[in-house]
A protein has these predicted regions:
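Active-site beta->alpha loop and helix N-cap motifs at the rims of alpha/beta catalytic domains
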Residues: 1-9
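Secondary-structure boundary elements
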Residues: 8, 12, 16-27, 77-82
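Catalytic cores of alpha/beta
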Residues: 12-16, 142-160
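Structural preference for beta-strand elements that scaffold enzyme active sites
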Residues: 25-29, 83-89, 96, 133-137, ...
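Active-site-proximal loop/turn and secondary-structure-junction residues that shape catalytic pockets
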Residues: 30-36, 92-96, 140-146, 162-166
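Glycine/Thr-rich beta-alpha phosphate-binding loop at enzyme active sites
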Residues: 36-132, 167-185
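Glycine-rich adenosine-cofactor-binding loop
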Residues: 126, 133-134, 138-143
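Ferredoxin-type iron-sulfur electron-transfer modules and their immediate structural context
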Residues: 185-225
Length: 225
């Protein structure tokens, strides 16, 4: 898991060590900041999350997409030479500013529904870059409404936490298990990058992920007689 601000050379050095010295299949967990500030701000704003506050600091300090792509190509080749698998875990939570005393700190970490439109775009970019040949594990806003599509697109393992913190708790896993029970499991043969592109394209208008507008209550007093 790449902590915010972790230098690219350190990420590559750690992953290379795990592959060549420890002989481990290795996945690097990336941060949503890799999308760039302008894209993240624009996509969240368009979906009703304009109240979520963040600046460009983490976007500037974190791993950049232009550095990540060649590094992941190198690590994938290194893993293949060692008879191992290399892939990405998408994604870490997203740091945002505390503005209403939600927590006794300056930052908190966004997950769940609002994270999905960012993480699925990360999956789209990397899946297209590698034409589906790079393994992707998913964790950014996976839930009942997208887990089947993710799995069928060749993205797995899929992990989740936020959805089981909602009403129903661990009981939601039964619902998810029943949904996936009808999916055929096949050995990894590539990510369907065209299917992932469609998921990302649809995300900004998918009502499951749009922040609903709450109408202000009618405070007008009735006319007196």
């Amino acid at each position: 898991s790449t902590l915010h601000g972790c230098p690219p050379n350190e990420i590559e050095a750690i992953a290379s060590y795990l592959i060549t010295e420890k002989h481990l299949n290795t996945f690097v967990k990336c941060n949503p900041t890799i999308l760039g500030y302008e894209f993240a701000r624009s996509r969240l704003d368009s979906m009703g999350y304009d109240y979520i506050a963040f600046d460009d600091r983490h976007f500037r300090e974190d791993l950049q997409y232009k550095d990540a792509v060649p590094m992941f190509h190198r690590l994938k080749e290194l893993a293949e030479k060692n008879g191992l698998e290399f892939g990405l875990k998408l994604s870490n939570t997203f740091p945002v500013d505390v503005k209403a005393n939600e927590l006794p700190s300056e930052e908190m970490y966004m997950s769940g529904r609002a994270l999905y439109p960012l993480t699925i775009e990360m999956a789209n970019r990397f899946a297209n870059e590698f034409k589906g040949a790079l393994r992707i594990s998913y964790s950014g806003g996976a839930d009942f409404f997208n887990i089947k599509q993710l799995f069928e697109a060749g993205i797995w393992p899929i992990t989740m936490a936020t959805t089981i913190l909602k009403p129903g708790g661990y009981g939601r896993m039964v619902q998810l298990g029943n949904l996936l029970d009808g999916c055929e499991f096949k050995p990894f043969a590539g990510v369907d990058y065209e299917a992932v592109a469609r998921l990302s394209e649809e995300a900004p208008t998918n009502f499951h992920y749009i922040k609903p507008i709450k109408e202000a209550p009618d405070r007008k007093m009735g006319k007196g007689k």
